[in-house]
Amino acid sequence: MLEQAKVYCIDIAAYAVMSNHFHAVLHINQAKSKGLTDIEVVQRWHQLYKGTLVSQQFERGEDLREDQWILLRRNIDEWRSRLMSISWFMRRLNETIARLANDEDECTGHFWEGRFKSQALLDEKALAACMAYVDLNPVRAAMAKTPEESQHTSVKKRAEKAKEAYSPNHPQQQVSELLNFAGNPKQDMPEGIPMRLTDYLELVDWTGRQIRENKRGSISECEPAIMHRLGIDAEHWLYITQNFESEFKGVVGAVNEVKSKISCFWDKQKERRRTAGIKACKLRLS
């Protein structure tokens, strides 16, 4: 997954690989995709697929006819789009895993039960909650006592790197394969996750302890400071970091953001327009 992300214009914010499934929080890096030159697009695509005879000639530096240029430019536009497509990213990743598993088991046929499921995260609250939900998979499954003891998770990789770093919140001292934590920037669209790495690690550690100790109705008063900045009630936070997938359907974020992003549909039985997922977002993230 991490190696494939280097080829695609997809950033990995969080991941957890379990025994029979995996979770990932992904960021589409449109600026990176648009900034690629034509030859860079072709080179990246050839790391994934064979491309075409014309694209192979182009990469070798051979002269092309005008009709070949027309065809190549059309392919480059399509490949540039695919390099920042989560669908194509997951398609390639699942194909690779299935091929390796089938080779290991010496069999053929379908490896995955169905297509992957995805949800759009619209704001910092939704992002933080989903990342924590993903990173805490092994803790919830009682496979690890703490996030740092878990295997094959982004939080373990980040925590190990942070212990070695002189300044763990500095982007250049964070895990290079993962999307950086950008601190608490004032601008609306920071380059990275809009919080400090150390705050997130503290938040996930605290959340993991609450889950492990099953503290329902007796939440510790020592809540991480970032909880107050995010503006999420502690009980709601603990609930959604254990039930994110079942609680939210589709787009996740503040109610006004969700309403502006997702399409409404007509419910003929109740004769009113409704928006999927609004109730859960209003209850848990307001």
Question: What spans do the regions from the language model cover?
Answer:
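Short catalytic/metal-binding and nucleic-acid-binding patches
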Residues: M1-S286
